[in-house]
Amino acid sequence: MYGGLNKMDKLKKALPFIFPPLAVLLIMGFAFYRHGLYPFGDGTVSWCDMSQQVIPLLTDFKDIFTGKDGMFLNFHNAGGMDLWGVFFFFIASPYTLLVLFVDKADIIYLVNILTVLKMMTAA
């Protein structure tokens, strides 16, 4: 025995940290499947403010990271604004970097994955 714990004891210690995120994944996976949400269909969890604010900000964030726009002065928002405050209020998360791996047209589906990942992290 290394460190005084056998494999079963290590599993028992880790289970409270592993079970809640997996439970969220299973519950959300079932809900997404049942309602035809991406990745099981074409639906999205995006509604109201997420469609009007968060998704456009994620597309702007992708443009900033790919060099098509600037973080300090962005003319695609409100006729020209500094995006720093908005970044920290809305989209400051390591998960936001996942926008770099999808097309701008698919960001509306990415928010489904981001929602589940954030809920799993919170669990």
Short names for language-model regions:
Residues 1-33:
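Start-transfer (signal-anchor) and selected internal transmembrane alpha helices
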Residues 27-122:
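Membrane-interface coil-to-helix junctions
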